[in-house]
Each structure stands twice: as C-alpha cells, then as structure tokens.
C-alpha cells in the first residue's frame, strides 16, 4: 500500500524534526505515486483501490486523495483494514519515522475508538476490543515487535 513512498525517500525518514508543509504535501502524493507503480502490471489491478484509498476516512469525508471515493470501492473492507493497520503502525513504531514521537498502544486504541464510524471502520475497532488474544498481540507488536518484523522482512526478502 505504501509503494509510492519509494518515490519520496528523500522526504521520509530523513530528519529529527517536524515535517514542513511542502514535505507533507509531497508525502500526501504517495498513494497516487503507488498507483502508477501498480499500473505497470495488470496482475496488480486488485490492489489499486487499497493503495489509493488507505488514507481515506471510513465515512469518505476526510483523508486523501480527495477525488477517490473509498465508500464506493468493491475493495472497501480491505481499504478499511489497511487504513487501520497503517494508522496503528504509523502511530506506534519507533523505526523509520524520525519526524514524530511514537504513541502508546493504549493512546492509539483510544484514538481508534474515538474515530470509529468516522475515520475507522467501527466493526474492525470492535473486533480488536472483543478478542483479547488479538488485542494482546497487537499491543505486543506495537510495544516490542516492529524491529523483529523488519528484520524478518529483511532476512526473507532482501538478502
């Protein structure tokens, strides 16, 4: 879903400071840039909407890009899953987001609950709250797991 960030690595993860307005504008272009990559192969067509819509709000009234209507996508539920996961990762990881401080898992869950129905799919938020094993695993990943996950990706795909 974030393949478009490959085009903007000079903006992302570079400095220990807040992003400028221009840098934020460039980062907001990554869904469209990602779509360009995916259009190279017809086999990737089913990923177009999730790449384009993973920063749109559940209710379609916020997020970006403005001209994409996630509420009409046949892949809406997948967009909702990727959106929630992306927000959780962005908020809790310490690796690769030098421009902001990570949040606690509890704070992120509070934000997900607060945004349920507007920004996030309420059924997905409820699912996390209703399944203790899922909640605990997500909490473990948020607190300890990102470096291990990145190392596994490196071991399996980059070497």
For each of these PLM feature ranges, what is it?
Residues 2-159:
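Histidine- and acidic-residue-rich, metal-dependent catalytic cores
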